[in-house]
């Protein structure tokens, strides 16, 4: 039997980063985690029309910083910043500390896996054929520079009596390569026939960490020094 692993979790610290960055002792850890989950739930519910890609939460000393990557920042900010100010107060009440909210625009939503998954789910809810929705999203991503993309949908497709899964792929999606920059997105479409799940895997290229490269160079240099010492010892013994 195969064992599936989360495509982001397996790459944490290699080619992916954490969505929450803070330190806590054993007593505070559960409270911080519950607050982060509630903040993400509230933001995605309140700003569902903004096209939220991801929400990053940081906790400096006695404050919090929430960064929202969205496709339509105007929906979050509102007229004269009124909406974002109300949002900041709600998030501050949940977290219990002063909160600063950053709104970061996603320039190319067609290259964001989460936004692509939500787009396909919305098309399915509008009763667009799932194959047409998948092929349209895949072609747009490849046209704008993605090296590979795979979209899979599962559920009662087109109202079929028996649920099944279908997928469509173009380009390369190397899931076994940990240095590969793989974007992952998941969304659900609530149709008259039930819930249809949508998964998107998008390949943007390989990530080569400068720290690992420098470490390899140091290792190679130390190996070279050891080899030079051995050769010098051998030459002395021959003499």
Swiss-Prot record:
Phylogenetic classification of the source organism: Bacteria, Pseudomonadati, Pseudomonadota, Gammaproteobacteria, Lysobacterales
UniProt-listed Pfam families: KH_2 (PF07650), Ribosomal_S3_C (PF00189)
A GO cellular-component term linked to this record: cytosolic small ribosomal subunit
Gene: rpsC
Keyword Oxidoreductase carried by entry: no
Residue ranges of every copy of the KH type-2 domain listed in the record: 39-107
Biological processes, Gene Ontology terms: translation
Gene Ontology molecular functions: mRNA binding; rRNA binding; structural constituent of ribosome
Functional note: Binds the lower part of the 30S subunit head. Binds mRNA in the 70S ribosome, positioning it for translation.
Record field: compositional bias (Basic and acidic residues): 216-239
Protein name, as recorded: Small ribosomal subunit protein uS3
Swiss-Prot/TrEMBL keywords: Ribonucleoprotein, Ribosomal protein, RNA-binding, rRNA-binding
Region described as Disordered: 214-239
Cross-referenced SUPFAM superfamilies: Prokaryotic type KH domain (KH-domain type II), Ribosomal protein S3 C-terminal domain
Stated family: Belongs to the universal ribosomal protein uS3 family.
Gene3D superfamilies, per the entry: 3.30.300.20, Ribosomal protein S3, C-terminal domain (3.30.1140.32)
Cross-referenced CDD domains: KH-II_30S_S3
Subunit relationships: Part of the 30S ribosomal subunit. Forms a tight complex with proteins S10 and S14.
Organism name: Xylella fastidiosa (strain Temecula1 / ATCC 700964)
Domain of life: Bacteria
Coiled-coil region: none
